[in-house]
Regions:
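Terminal leader/tail segments of proteins
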Residues: 1-114
Length: 114
């Protein structure tokens, strides 16, 4: 469970948007980078979006989850936590670094690959 995502969901419930930043420093140039963002849309808060470094990775719309993109183990962790917190269902996601392959599995069958 990714505590950062849980905290962002709680904040987004109150504010509509919640962001978490990371701080990267290379060659003496500090840079403030948005790591995660959770956005709530709709009058009843029906549509939720999860962004990781500016890329849309998952959406929950009216209780139906959609995995949009993934390419790392941190994407697997954040997407699983995001969907589990909002729907109560934990999706089966896998990242294989040796193959550079991200898969979404439902009912034992691969439904998406990135």
């Amino acid at each position: 469970m990714n505590k950062t995502i849980v905290k962002l969901i709680e904040r987004a419930c109150r504010k509509g948007v919640a962001k978490a930043y990371s701080y990267s420093d290379y060659y003496g140039n500090p840079e403030h980078v948005e790591k995660y963002r959770v956005v709530v849309e709709g009058t009843e808060g029906d549509i939720w979006h999860l962004y990781h470094y500016g890329t849309l990775t998952a959406t929950v719309s009216f209780g139906v989850e959609t995995v949009e993109y993934g390419e790392s183990r941190s994407d697997v962790d954040s997407i699983q936590t995001f969907i589990e917190e909002l729907t109560g269902f934990t999706p089966e996601l896998h990242y294989y670094p040796s193959k550079d392959l991200f898969t979404v599995v439902k009912n034992g069958k691969v439904v998406k690959q990135f």
